[in-house]
Amino acid sequence: MYSSRILKYEGRSKFGSSCARILRAKSEIPAVVYGKESDVLHIKINSNEFDKKFAKFTDNTVLLLNDGMVEKCVFIKDVSENLTKKFIYHIDFYEVDRTREIERDISIKFIGASVGVKEGGTLSVLRNTVKVKALPLNLPEFVEVDLTPVKKGDQITLKDIVLSDNVKLSETDENLAVLFVK
C-alpha cells in the first residue's frame, strides 16, 4: 500500500548553487527535511523516481523517506520548479511524528449524480474540505461523498461524511452543511 509513497534518499554534505547544479546534472534533486523536534537534514533524491510519483501526490500525501536505515514520515512543504522546462530545483519536506495524531484539512470529492439535480434542482456546494484528525499514515488524501441519493431539499452535513475507523472528524460543529440541493 505504501510502496508508492516511499522515496529513497541519501544525505549530502555539500551546499550552494554550484553543488545543487552538479546534483541536478546527475538526475538528483537537492532537498531539505525540517521538523519540529529534529535538526535540518540536507538530502538528495533521485529525480526520475520523484517525477514518476510526484503527479499522484496531494498536500495530504504522507511520504516515507528511506535511506536504508532510517525511515522518515514527511509531507511535501514546498517544491521549487521551473514549469516550462518541467524541472525541479529543490524540495522542502516537513517531518512529522508517525505516532502522534495530526489535524489536516482534507479535500472532499463528490461522486455520482444527484437525484435532485436530475429532477431539475440546483446543487450548491458550501465546503470543499473537512478537518480530520488521524495518525499520519492513516490520513486519507481525500474523502468521497456520494451525491446519488441526494434529493431536492436534502443537504449533506459534516456528520454525514463517512470516515474510516482510524480517522476522526475534527470540526467544532458537525451539523454544518457541506452541500444542499434546492
Curated annotation (Swiss-Prot):
Known Gene3D superfamilies for this protein? Ribosomal protein L25, beta domain (2.170.120.20), Ribosomal Protein L25, Chain P (2.40.240.10)
BP term (GO), one: translation
Name the Pfam families for this protein: Ribosomal_L25p, Ribosomal_TL5_C
Which SUPFAM superfamilies does the entry link to?
Ribosomal protein L25-like (SSF50715)
What positions belong to coiled-coil segments?
Answer: none
Does the keyword section mention Ribosomal protein? Answer: yes
Give UniProt keywords alphabetically. Ribonucleoprotein, Ribosomal protein, RNA-binding, rRNA-binding
What InterPro entries does this protein's entry cite? Rbsml_bL25/Gln-tRNA_synth_N, Ribosomal_bL25/Gln-tRNA_synth, Ribosomal_bL25_b-dom, Ribosomal_bL25_C, Ribosomal_bL25_long, Ribosomal_L25_dom, Ribosomal_uL5_bac-type
Say yes or no: keyword Ribosomal protein present: yes
Picking any one GO molecular function of the record gives:
structural constituent of ribosome
Q: Describe the family membership recorded for this protein in Swiss-Prot or TrEMBL.
A: Belongs to the bacterial ribosomal protein bL25 family. CTC subfamily.
What does the record note on quaternary structure? Answer: Part of the 50S ribosomal subunit; part of the 5S rRNA/L5/L18/L25 subcomplex. Contacts the 5S rRNA. Binds to the 5S rRNA independently of L5 and L18.
What's its job?
This is one of the proteins that binds to the 5S RNA in the ribosome where it forms part of the central protuberance.
In Swiss-Prot or TrEMBL terms, this protein is called Large ribosomal subunit protein bL25
Tell me the organism's taxonomic lineage. Answer: Bacteria, Pseudomonadati, Spirochaetota, Spirochaetia, Spirochaetales
> Which gene is the coding source of this polypeptide chain?
rplY
